[in-house]
Amino acid sequence: MFQFCLLILLLAPGRFFSALGKPQETLTVENREGSDSKAIPTCREASFCAFLQKNPIDSNLDVLPTCTCTGGTTCSHSWDPNDGKSITEGNKQFKFCSNVPDTIKHECSAEEKALTGIFEEDKVTKKHLAYYGFLHCICPEHSDYPENSYDGTETVEGDKKITTEYYHCERLKTCKSDDTCHALAIGETKKIYYKDCNCPEGQTCPFELKSAYKTEYKETTDKFTTYSMRCQ
């Protein structure tokens, strides 16, 4: 999905697990002025403030904050599909600082831009500065934001390089023999799950780490090992 994302500078299979594939980068980033390395940036209008996942690895709820709400408003990190500030897509939930805009409350069409991810980094040091995510519609059941579904642009503003990526919502395909069926990013405090395709009938996608055909260790502001699985 998250070349994660989340939230990486690249965790493996994608940007922010394709727009949410930079989990470790959203947990600790440099703020807009660079004065506090533990801060996360202030939310932009209509951006989601956190990404929640009910984790099939250990049944825990993992939370990836992306920005800080303003005006004394807090970003809820509790799973609640009925609070008016959440969009739920299967085991994922996007949280907003205020009520979800009405323009989002419809199912994505095949041609529609479903999600926009904006990544800011220092153009010299490549240090990740901020991630802003914007939903444009609701991705229906059995669909997701696959890694190959995006296009994007790059611009430079002052000392920052800004990458804008646009994702489409697509129905998950049946895995081929050499496809990654899902990836498990295991960190010191968080575990992120990304499903890439559905295994053929009679096969399953394993969760045992020893079954991974590929592992990748990544250390930036946090430490993650990504385990890529194939259908068995």
UniProtKB/Swiss-Prot annotation:
Signal peptide stretch: 1-21
Record propeptide residues: 22-32
This protein's record includes keyword Secreted: yes
Gene Ontology CC terms: extracellular region
Subcellular location: Secreted
Tissue specificity of this protein: Expressed by the venom gland.
GO MF annotation terms: toxin activity
Alphabetically ordered keywords of this record: Disulfide bond, Secreted, Signal, Toxin
Modifications the protein undergoes after translation, according to the UniProt entry: Contains 8 disulfide bonds.
Keyword Signal: yes
Gene3D superfamilies, alphabetized: 2.20.20.160
Family affiliation: Belongs to the scoloptoxin-11 family.
Protein name according to UniProt: U-scoloptoxin(11)-Ssd2a
Lineage, opening ranks: Eukaryota, Metazoa, Ecdysozoa, Arthropoda, Myriapoda
